C-alpha cells in the first residue's frame, strides 16, 4: 500500500500537554525497567483508603498464571468517581445525557450524581444485595445506567452489564454463568426512533429453567410502555428509591476484590466472563484516560460507545469520572434523525474530545459532506478511534471532514481483556500515521513473535502480537474458569499474553494491527492480513465497506473472497468489477487481487458494529448447515440474504 503520510504533533497541543515526546520516552522507559517504582508513584492517581505497599505480584507461567496489583491497598470506586470531587467541584457537571430524540437532554452535577447513587445503593441493599453479590444490568443508555453501575461499586456488588441489544437467550446465558442475584432493566429502551422491549426480553430470559438465582428485577420507567408485571419479583426503580436515605457510606474494598464481569463472545462454546478487579482497573482507567486523551480540567468528553461494552465501562464511566471530567451519555445512533447528528451533538455540547468507532466513521463517510452539514465542530481538540483497526482513508476523512484538520486522532488498540488502552499515540508526544496505533502505553511491553513463539528482534517485523508482562488493567481470570483463562491467553506462547491479533512494526517502531490472527490469509505461500486488503478496497471512492475471507483453492491454498458494500448511488457492473480488481492489484499487488467479488448492501454485524467474519467464511465456502450462535447479530435476516446472493454467484 502507498506509504503513510506523517502528521507531526500540532504546536497548539505541544504547548499545553501532559506529555511531550521526551516525557513519554522517559516515563515509558521507567515503566518497563522499573514497573514497581513507576506504578508505586502513578497508582496514587486514585485515592486509597488504606494505601498499598505491595505494587506488583504477577506471573504468566503455565499452570501458575496469577495477576495481582496493589493487593494490600483498599479503596472504593464510586468514592473515586464522585465523592472526591464534591468539595471543589460538586456543582460541576458530571454527566450530560443526550436522548435519542434531539429535544431530550439533561445534566447531572457531581452533587446530584452523588445523591442519586447513594439512594440507589440503599435501594439495592433493600432488595437484598450484599457485598460480593452479582447484579446484572440490561439497560438503555440513560443516566440511570451509570447510576446503577456506580451504586454497585459503592456497596461492593459486582456488576455484569449486558448490552441492551442482546437477545433473551444471550441474556439468560450471562445470568446463569454469573449467578446474578438481581436484574436492573427498563420498561423499554429507545434507539434510532424505535422502542427496544427490554423488560419483555428480561421476562423471557428468566423463563429459562437454568436461571435459578434471580430474586428481584428493578425496572426503570423510560417510555411508559406496557409491561407484564410479576408482583413478587418486579420492583419499579422510582418506588424503590422513593423512601430511602440519600446517604450511603462507600464500602471499603480490597484492590483485588472483583469489580465487574463483562462477557465477550468466545470463538467456541459459551461466552467468556472477563473478570476485572477494583484497584488495578481503576488506576489504569484513570491513567489511560488522562494521558491518551490528554484530558485537561473542564473539558467535555464524548465516548459514543454503549455501557454494555468495555469501551463504555472504561471511557464513558470510570476513566472520565475518576478524572472529574464531563462525560456525555448518548442514547441514540450517529445517523438519527439525520446523518449530521453526531456533528450536531458535538456543537450542541461543545465537545472537546470525541471517541468513536471506525464502523460509525465509515457509515458517515459513505454519506459525504451530509455528515457535517450545518455544523462547525470547532470545539474539538482531540479525536479517537476504537474497536478495530481504522483504515487510512477513513482516518483521513475523520481528520479532515469531522476534525477540520485541527484535532489529532488517537487510534487506540486494546481489548475487553486488557481493561484499557494498550497501544495508542499520545497527542502531545506522537507523530501520527493514518492506520497505525503507533506506540505502547506506559507499562505495556508488546512484542511480535513467529508461530513458534520466537521473539522477532528486528525493528521492522510482522508476526503475532503478544504482551510480555502484566499491566494494572489486565483481566484476572475468566469468571469461574481459571483454566480457560490460562488456555485462551497463555498456552499458545509460553510466558506471554497472546492477544490473538497480528501486527507489523515499522522502521519507527510503530505498531500496525493487521487483524485477528484467524483473519490471516495464506495465498500461494504469502501471508496477508484481511485488514490490509479491506483497507485497499475501502480506499476506492465507490466502496463504503468491505470484508475479506479466505476460501479453499486447489492451487493457491486459499483464494480471496471479498464482500463489498458500495456507497449510496453506486451500483455493481462489469466495469466496476474489473476496476475494483485492478485497484487492489495497484494498491497491494497481484497476489492480493480478490478472486470473488460479492456485492451486497449489508454485512452481518454484531450490535457493537463488528463484522461477524465466522459467518462470512461459512457462507463463502458454502458451509451453511451450522452457522453457530447468531443471537448477537444486529439483523439476523442479513444472513439469508447473503446466502441467496451467493447462490446467484455460482
UniProtKB/Swiss-Prot annotation:
GO biological process, alphabetically ordered: acetyl-CoA biosynthetic process from acetate
Residues reported in the UniProt entry to bind ATP: 387-389, 411-416, 501, 516, 527
ATP-binding found in the keyword field: yes
InterPro entries: Ac_CoA_lig (IPR011904), ACAS_N (IPR032387), AMP-bd_C (IPR025110), AMP-bd_C_sf (IPR045851), AMP-binding_CS (IPR020845), AMP-dep_synth/lig_dom (IPR000873), ANL_N_sf (IPR042099)
EC number: 6.2.1.1
Gene3D superfamilies per the UniProt record, alphabetical: 3.30.300.30, N-terminal domain of ligase-like (3.40.50.12780)
Post-translational modification: Acetylated. Deacetylation by the SIR2-homolog deacetylase activates the enzyme.
Reactions it catalyzes: acetate + ATP + CoA = acetyl-CoA + AMP + diphosphate
Statement: the UniProt record of this protein carries the keyword Hydrolase: no
Record SUPFAM superfamilies: Acetyl-CoA synthetase-like (SSF56801)
Protein name: Acetyl-coenzyme A synthetase
Record HAMAP family: Ac_CoA_synth (MF_01123)
The entry's keywords: Acetylation, ATP-binding, Ligase, Magnesium, Metal-binding, Nucleotide-binding
Task performed by this protein: Catalyzes the conversion of acetate into acetyl-CoA (AcCoA), an essential intermediate at the junction of anabolic and catabolic pathways. AcsA undergoes a two-step reaction. In the first half reaction, AcsA combines acetate with ATP to form acetyl-adenylate (AcAMP) intermediate. In the second half reaction, it can then transfer the acetyl group from AcAMP to the sulfhydryl group of CoA, forming the product AcCoA.
PTM-bearing positions, type N6-acetyllysine: 610
GO cellular component: cytosol
Cofactors, names only: Mg(2+)
